Amino acid sequence: MNMLTALLVNITLSMLLIIVAFWLPQLNLYTEKANPYECGFDPMGSARLPFSMKFFLVAITFLLFDLEIALLLPLPWAIQMYNIDIMMLTAFILVSVLALGLAYEWLQKGLEWTE
């Protein structure tokens, strides 16, 4: 199976699932289904509390650097390859882009909790 066939099959299945999801109505939507579930007890308060934007920015930054580690973990195995220069250049570019992003976030005071 060549790459084009696999791509077409994946796109077709994805579009089919999206179309079916939009065409099917939301059946039996009532207030009990829309309420949050807290271990069988009635909720003590509202579950729709506002989310801290500062925490969100720190969490996204953490996820980006976690992704960096996940992408750099195969580096020791890549060193065993014949073309080490391309792998090291790619790793350097990845770390540089993320370091520039962190520096920009730091200069914009996006990581500080106090206003």
Swiss-Prot record:
Keywords: Electron transport, Membrane, Mitochondrion, Mitochondrion inner membrane, NAD, Respiratory chain, Translocase, Transmembrane, Transmembrane helix, Transport, Ubiquinone. One of its GO terms (molecular function) is NADH dehydrogenase (ubiquinone) activity. GO terms for biological process: mitochondrial electron transport, NADH to ubiquinone. The keyword Transferase does not apply. It is found in: Mitochondrion inner membrane. Gene3D superfamilies: NADH:ubiquinone/plastoquinone oxidoreductase, chain 3 (1.20.58.1610). This is NADH-ubiquinone oxidoreductase chain 3. It comes from Peromyscus maniculatus.
